[in-house]
């Protein structure tokens, strides 16, 4: 619903205090709300740089009339977009793959590319769907590091759906636990891991006293760093 795929039957979705409930995904995109996917969707036969340059909306070069009658304007815009892409590549420290076909990237590199796409339009809120899935530990650390930087240095807000509790513990406060489509509880990760209602809902048991109980390993966790 937050991403615009479904229209809620009640309640509101607010972005910067403005009601965006029911807006389609492309309108949310223009307002700065973007998402990544558990399975990356790259343009596999385009380079990493070209994938980034595809992101900004309403580029003059997309219009046949502008491309034909305003070539100088199109060239200026393309230069600016390419410069922005280079800045993103440098920020994420993946300039070494800028000319690589995106389809040749590893799973973790594709997730970095998806994160880079959100930077091409200076997103306000980014929805991260299972960003740790299929990513080796080294690249996952890179992902988490860059998410932290985007939050602390550029003011991005992240809404995370994730089952990797180490990642959630590092990134997210608060953590929201949902069951059967409703919010069960929210709070700091350490409190969530000891919450009897969470343990009962997901394991049908009670806490054993272990502060790192696996009880919170299954809930979908949504959070803002």
Describe the residue ranges of each PLM region.
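ABC ATPase NBD Q-loop/coupling interface
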Residues: 12-31, 69-75
């Amino acid at each position: 619903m937050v991403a615009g795929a479904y229209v809620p039957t009640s309640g509101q979705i607010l972005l910067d205090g403005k009601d965006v409930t029911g807006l389609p995904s492309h309108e949310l995109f223009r307002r700065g709300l973007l998402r990544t996917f558990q399975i990356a969707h790259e343009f596999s036969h385009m380079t990493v740089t070209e994938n980034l340059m595809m992101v900004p909306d309403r580029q003059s070069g997309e219009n046949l009339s502008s491309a034909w009658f305003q070539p100088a304007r199109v060239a200026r815009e393309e230069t600016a977009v390419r410069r922005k892409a280079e800045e993103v590549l440098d920020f994420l420290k993946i300039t070494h793959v800028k000319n690589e076909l995106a389809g040749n990237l590893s799973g973790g590199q594709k997730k970095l590319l998806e994160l880079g796409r959100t930077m091409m339009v200076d997103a306000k809120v980014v929805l991260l769907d299972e960003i740790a899935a299929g990513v080796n530990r080294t690249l996952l650390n890179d992902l988490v590091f860059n998410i932290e930087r985007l939050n602390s240095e550029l003011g991005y807000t992240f809404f995370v759906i994730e089952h990797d509790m180490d990642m959630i513990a590092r990134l997210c406060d608060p953590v929201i636990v949902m069951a059967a489509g409703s919010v069960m509880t929210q709070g700091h990760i350490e409190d969530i891991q000891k919450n009897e209602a969470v343990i009962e809902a997901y394991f049908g048991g009670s806490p054993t006293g272990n502060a790192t109980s696996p009880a919170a390993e299954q809930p979908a966790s949504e959070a803002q760093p």
